[in-house]
Regions:
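Sec-dependent bacterial lipoprotein signal peptides
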Residues: 1-24
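Mature, structured domains of secreted/extracytosolic soluble proteins
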Residues: 22-447
Length: 447
């Protein structure tokens, strides 16, 4: 009897609970169950500071991105101030945002929004890992500002200073800029020509005709089925289904590793004739079977100067933090089997036929064709300067040469270029000493 009594009580409780659950279902929850949202979205952050961002807010509204900035997600908003927008408009002969076309507002908006959240603590000197919504990568760099008492200042594309940074909002982060971001629309050869600090290199690039190879951007031979782009291809892993999406377009991009005029001068190379002689001395030794056969045929791939320039060019995009595993944000100790015995290294083909270059990243920075570990090297190699170092060198060298110091932009529409600290060649030491090594190739760089 006792068991039946307990059973009836349990059934009664279950029925009462079900009844309560049924009767409590309502379109309007009790007041104490309301969630009151108090945080700011990106859109709120901008709206609540009209004295700073009213012009940029108008641009976002006209482009249609304003609504996205009011939704949940993970965004980085690089917001130019009203003063920055006024300067941008003045440079184009406009007096207000209303004079911009819809297309111009689209481009402005896309250039300043990244669909991922990046605080300055997440970034290092080099490329911001995710492209902006205009599918352009931006450069992040830092420098000390004497006017600000030596405090570290952060820049996007070497020109737009983060005057306020790391303001967290519910759907990302906002950084305030003192200048509108203007990614270059120039192709890589055109951007190189703008830099007066590398005029000797660009003269040789033009003479060899290799500049013509750097104008490619979109591969018109590429085709991918729309379903593979939009719906993806299913695959299974660890019991779960995933989808792999193919790119709609295949883009062609390039990297140039460039000596400044000062680096050439320190090696005794002061003009184009000096550079021709230097290249001939190196490559006649490397290719004795071709010595003297193509000396005046500058566009021939076996010409010494042509070989010299081609070895400075890579047929893909490489920011300084792209080249080795340790530079890609992956933990150094987990990616190198014995980090005390080997630097993180990768190998890349160049645009000089039949050649590669070795990229290593000891703590001193990124080096080309280095032999050894950390400071224990037998061949130092050639250092690739960071964006911060590059801007400093650019400004100092132009000032020393009595030339106007203009704005530096290393990112072209279809590529990027870096300053290097020594004359780069594929010489006998590189072939016989540096490349006398076990080649460990990161398969990602082969795609």
């Amino acid at each position: 009897m006792k068991g039946k009594s307990i059973y009836k009580s349990l059934v009664g409780l279950m029925f009462f609970g079900a009844l309560q659950a049924f009767t409590s279902c309502s379109d309007e929850p009790d007041a104490e169950n309301y969630y009151t949202f108090t945080g700011e979205m990106v859109s709120d952050y901008l709206d609540n500071r009209p004295e700073q961002f009213s012009d940029f807010t108008k641009v976002l509204q006209r482009s249609g991105l304003y609504g996205m900035m009011a939704t949940y997600g993970t965004y980085t908003c690089l917001a130019p101030t009203n003063e920055a927008m006024a300067q941008y408009l003045k440079e184009r002969g406009f007096s207000s945002v209303e004079e911009l076309t819809k297309e111009e507002c689209d481009t402005l908006s896309w250039n300043h929004i990244i669909a991922e959240t990046y605080f300055t603590t997440d970034l290092s000197d080099g490329k911001i890992p995710t492209a902006n919504m205009n599918e352009r990568f931006l450069t992040f760099s830092c420098d000390s500002d004497a006017v600000e008492g030596g405090n570290v200042m952060y820049y996007v594309n070497m020109a737009s200073k983060l005057v306020v940074r790391d303001d967290s909002v519910e759907n990302g982060v906002v950084h305030t800029l003192n200048r509108v971001i203007q990614p270059s629309s120039a192709y890589l050869p055109e951007l190189l020509l703008e830099d007066k600090n590398i005029s000797l290199f660009t003269s040789a690039l033009t003479l060899t005709g290799l500049n013509d190879s750097l104008y490619e951007y979109i591969d018109n031979t590429y085709y991918c089925d729309p379903d593979s782009v939009n719906k993806g291809i299913p695959f299974h892993r660890t019991g779960a289904e995933y989808r792999m999406y193919y790119p709609a377009n295949r883009m062609k991009r390039f990297t140039a590793l460039v000596e400044t005029n000062k680096v050439f001068a320190e090696a005794g190379i002061h003009n184009l004739d000096d550079l021709k002689a230097y290249a001939k001395d190196v490559y006649d030794k490397m290719y004795p079977e071709d010595a003297g056969l193509y000396d005046e045929d500058w566009t021939n791939r076996k010409n010494p100067l042509n070989r010299f320039i081609a070895y400075h060019l890579l047929p893909y995009y490489g920011a300084i933090n792209d080249f080795t595993i340790s530079e890609s944000g992956i933990d150094y100790k987990t990616t190198c089997a014995m980090p005390n015995l080997i630097d993180c290294t990768d190998w890349y083909t160049t645009m000089m036929p039949g050649t590669v270059m070795k990229m290593s990243s000891p703590s001193e920075g990124l080096f080309i064709n280095r032999k050894g570990v950390a400071s224990r090297f037998s061949v130092r190699g050639t250092k690739v300067y960071t964006p911060t170092e590059m801007k400093t060198i650019h400004d100092q060298d132009l000032a020393e040469a009595g030339l106007p110091v203009d704005t530096l932009n290393q990112q072209a529409l279809n590529g990027i270029y870096h300053y290097i600290d020594n004359v780069l060649t594929y010489n006998e030491e590189t072939r016989d000493v540096v490349f006398n090594d076990r080649i460990r190739w990161n398969v990602v760089t082969m795609s």
